[in-house]
From Swiss-Prot:
Source species, domain of life: Eukaryota
Transmembrane segment boundaries: 73-93, 110-130, 153-173, 187-207, 215-235, 241-261
Keyword vocabulary terms for this entry: Membrane, Transmembrane, Transmembrane helix, Vacuole
Membrane protein topology class: Multi-pass membrane protein
Organism: Schizosaccharomyces pombe (strain 972 / ATCC 24843) (Fission yeast)
Protein name: Meiotic drive suppressor wtf16
Coiled coil region boundaries: none
């Protein structure tokens, strides 16, 4: 069976199509009229127009090679020198505090000083050479932290935990006779104040929630301290320095864990007594079930012994 196909194109259309070599694009529509006498007037769908109007040029694809966006060398050098300068200022302050800044330097001290200068020089060269890379990384990190306030809270709190542990070490090796358990509460309050200063732009309900969680954590810590002190007084025992350190460390870890848990799950501390009661009830119920199963096992064994036929017992007695 032959297909009776009749082309709808007229001979004139076929002749024009063979001359131009282009078909009408159904999505773009008909070609608009243009004046060929004007300079640079080209059909908008022509290949040359696509090349000339391409949005991605070589300069836009290579922004690092463009001279407009690049910083001058002196500015790069100054910005790269800033973190090294801050680090050296901190080192000088520490040496001044120890009263060891260029005092009684021997061969080992001068060797260490020369090595430090070499490291700072290499770091400056590295930061200047890879200026675009590390500045872009810093910008991306800063923008990401600013856009995610929840991560800010986590990061600042973890940093403050590290700072508090450093303070514990300084107090441990120093001559400060302080109760380490009270330091935990001080660190918690100072951490909350630090968060408050850094998060002034937070909504009021977030700050209210933060302080509510803080006071609940302090309440838990106070209960633990009172119970511990009461037991020590009851048994007429005193906590030595090691005991204070253990108490302070445990309270600090528990306090930070509860605070972080409360910030992540609002109302968790209020629901904790119910969870504790349910846990104790489940534990006691499990013990009761275990005891009941043991009793059933003994009871079943006694029933099996009582169900032995009388003939078998008589036969065993005759033997």
């Amino acid at each position: 069976m032959k297909n009776n196909y009749t082309s709808l194109k007229s001979p004139i259309d076929e002749g024009d199509e063979s001359k131009t070599g282009h078909e009408i694009d159904l999505e773009k529509g008909l070609l608009p009229e243009y004046d060929s006498e004007e300079e640079g007037a080209l059909p908008p769908y022509s290949d040359h127009a696509r090349v000339s109007n391409s949005p991605n040029t070589h300069r836009e694809n290579n922004p690092s090679r463009s001279t407009d966006n690049s910083s001058p060398f002196l500015i790069k050098l100054l910005i790269s020198f800033t973190p090294i300068y801050v680090l050296n200022v901190l080192a000088i302050c520490y040496l001044k505090y120890k009263d060891a800044f260029f005092k009684n330097y021997g061969a080992a001290e001068w060797t260490l000083f020369g090595f430090w200068c070499l490291v700072c020089t290499l770091a400056l060269i590295f930061l200047t050479y890879f200026y675009e890379t590390w500045t872009k990384a810093v910008k991306v990190t800063a923008v990401g932290l600013y856009n995610s306030r929840k991560k800010w809270v986590v990061i600042i709190w973890l940093l403050w935990v590290v700072i508090c542990f450093v303070l514990f070490g300084c107090i441990k090796f120093g001559n400060l006779n302080l109760d380490k358990a009270l330091i935990c509460s001080t660190c918690s309050i100072s951490a909350a104040l630090l968060l408050f200063l850094l998060y002034v732009r937070l909504p009021f309900w977030t700050l209210k929630h933060m302080f509510s969680g803080l006071f609940q954590v302090l309440g838990v810590q106070s209960c633990v301290v009172i119970v511990t002190k009461g037991l020590m007084y009851l048994f007429d025992k005193h906590i030595d320095a090691t005991g204070y350190e253990i108490e302070a460390t445990s309270l600090f870890v528990i306090g930070n864990f509860f605070f972080f848990y409360e910030m992540e799950c609002p109302g968790a501390l209020k629901r904790m007594p119910k969870f504790i009661r349910n846990g104790i009830a489940s534990f006691l119920e499990g013990i009761g079930n275990a005891i009941g199963r043991i009793g059933n096992a003994f009871r079943g064994a006694n029933d099996n012994n009582n169900n032995i036929p009388l003939e078998e017992t008589e036969a065993e007695s005759e033997v």
